[in-house]
Amino acid sequence: MVVRIRLSRFGCKNRPFFRVMAADSRSPRDGKHLEVLGYFNPLPGQDGGKRMGLKFDRIKYWLSVGAQPSDPVQRLLFRSGLLPPPPMVAMGRKGGARDTRPVDPMTGRYVDAENKTVNANDNQPKEEDTEAKSA
């Protein structure tokens, strides 16, 4: 049994409200769960922000016993400071070859094998370099 930490949808039509749940990966989205770990309201409140409440000690427990967060929950846990940022991959042009080098989410730069950051636009030759080579 693989335990996943995921969102379960509640609320009316066009007014979603989510609970953060620890549930078996085979159970349906809104089905049987093991524990409620928090809530997330994506609609802006009176202050204009989204509301989120999490039980950090229980989330840390479930992560320590091997529970896997879903992608939306991983982004929520990153925003709350509980997990490191999820890995991002730079995408090339539409229809062209994809660049699969990892990207640092804080700076938006490529990360080399030696953990050095390289500017994302440095992989393209500059106009001055191409003119010097042709001359």
Curated annotation (Swiss-Prot):
Family: Belongs to the bacterial ribosomal protein bS16 family.
Domain of life: Eukaryota
Keywords: Chloroplast, Mitochondrion, Plastid, Ribonucleoprotein, Ribosomal protein, Transit peptide
Regions of compositional bias (Basic and acidic residues) in chain numbering: 124-135
Signal peptide per UniProt: none
Gene Ontology terms for molecular function: structural constituent of ribosome
Subcellular location: Mitochondrion; Plastid, Chloroplast
Protein name: Small ribosomal subunit protein bS16m/bS16c
Expression tissues: Expressed at low levels in flowers, and, to a lower extent, in leaves, stems and roots.
Transit peptide: 1-7
InterPro entries, A to Z: Ribosomal_bS16 (IPR000307), Ribosomal_bS16_dom_sf (IPR023803)
